[in-house]
Amino acid sequence: RLMELQLAAKLGVSRTPIREAIRMLEQEGLAVTIPRKGAEVAKMTEKDMEDVLQIREALDELAAKIACEQISEEQLEELVATMHEFEESTKTDNVKKIAEADVKFHDIIYQSTGNPKLVNMLNNLREQMYRYRVEYLKDENNYPTLMKEHKDIVEGLVRKNKMQVTATMHQHVKNQAVAVKAMIQEQE
C-alpha cells in the first residue's frame, strides 16, 4: 500500500505532492486507488505486459532499423562498452545495476536514431517497461540469452544489417514477454 502520511513524513513533504505523484502513477497504470483503503501498487497482469511489450517491440525494431543508418562510430564504441558493462553487472546480485546497464544499452540505440520524437515515445514507455525488465532480470538463467542478443544487435549495427538487427530485437522482446508471462502466471 502507498500510505500518504508515511510517504509524506519519510520524504519531508506535505501530502499534496504525494497525492499528485500517486495520481500520476495511476495514469501510468502503476498504481490503483481502492475506495476507503487508499492507493496500492498495481499488480502486473499478462494483458498489461502484452500491451506494453507490443508497443516496445514495434518501437525498438524501428529504432534499431533507423540506428543501422544513423549510428556513429563513437556511439558504436559506447554501445560495445555498455554491452561489456552489462555483462559485468550480471556477475553481481544487484538487479538494479543490471537493469541500469540494460536501459543504458537500449538508450544508446534510441539516441543514435537522431529522432527526438521516437526517443520521447520510448522514454514515456520506460516506467511501464521497467517493472517487466526488472522481473526478467531477476532470473539469472536469462543472462546468457540476453548477452548473446546484445552481441548480435551490436554486430548487426556494425554491419548495418537491418534484417539481422530487427530480427534480433524482435526476438529480444519476445523472449522477455515469454519469461515475464511465466512469472506472472506463477504469482497468480
Predicted regions and their residues:
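Residue-level signal for the nucleotide or nucleotide-sugar donor/cofactor binding architecture
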Residues: V13, N141, R159-K160
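Alpha-helix N-cap/N′ positions at the starts of helices
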Residues: R36, L59, A81, T145-K148
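Short helix-capping/hinge motifs at transmembrane helix termini and TM-loop junctions
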Residues: C68-E69, G114, K138-D139
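Short linear motifs at protein or domain termini
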Residues: R1-K65, E69, Q111, A177, ...
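C-terminal peripheral helix-coil segments that are non-catalytic and often amphipathic
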Residues: D152-R159, A167, N175-V178, A182-E188
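Conserved amphipathic alpha-helical segments that form helical-bundle/coiled-coil interaction surfaces
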Residues: V52, E73-E135, K148-E155, Q164, ...
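Mobile beta-alpha loop/short-helix "lid" or hinge segments that flank ligand
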Residues: E26-V32, L125-E127, N141-P144
